[in-house]
Amino acid sequence: MDARNRLIVGLDVATVTEAEKLVSTLAEDVTFYKIGYQLAFAGGLEFARDLAQSGKKVFLDMKLLDIDNTVASAVENIVRMGMTMLTLHAYPKAMQAAVEAAQGSGLCLLGVTVLTSMDDQDLNDAGYQGDARSLVLKRAAQAKEKGMGGIVCSAQEAQAVRAILGSDMAIVTPGIRPAGSDAGDQKRVMTPADAIHAGSSHLVVGRPIVKADDPRAATQVILAEMQAAFT
């Protein structure tokens, strides 16, 4: 298994110019990129199309949630953009609408369970009863039932989630931090090797690469750790 197909670099930058520079710097070491709100609203959607047309894989992290018809219409347009992955919140009706809209397209739909920046207290403050792990597992089961391509969750829950999803669905894990690096605003973090061993199929890494003094060197260290974990 080639780790380059499983590392997703988060283009967490403010401008398309910065994103273009980073993609050029990382060259052939990276084949998969994530574009979220920050870049999307600064011309990043056109850039996402360009990346896909250049042969890169693009994970559009939009975390969709709306009425069924609106979600379905958005998914249909995103399919036409040539994206590889798309996130939506793991609510049953939204997932069902998205799956029906994406049918036959090859777009991998990912259900967002609980953000890796949140812990049990954050959920309690938001009015949820129970703990983050229980909610992640419940939403993972719902995502499987609705026919989603995978889910997004912390590597701390990946092993339990893998037992629910089986071997075919993707487990995409943000909050990845190489040993010794700053966790930043993430609360449920894990190293690349530990995340792979726990059952994650794809790792999303942003700041440890984007903010590194040498982004390409930082990427190569992470890829080597992932490759060793896969073998």
From Swiss-Prot:
Identify this protein by name.
Orotidine 5'-phosphate decarboxylase
Going by the UniProt record, its keywords in alphabetical order are: Decarboxylase, Lyase, Pyrimidine biosynthesis
Q: Name one GO molecular function term.
A: orotidine-5'-phosphate decarboxylase activity
Record pathway: Pyrimidine metabolism; UMP biosynthesis via de novo pathway; UMP from orotate: step 2/2
Give the E.C. number(s).
4.1.1.23
Q: Which GO terms describe its cellular component?
A: cytosol
**Cystine pairs:** none
- Active site per the UniProt annotation: 63 (proton donor)
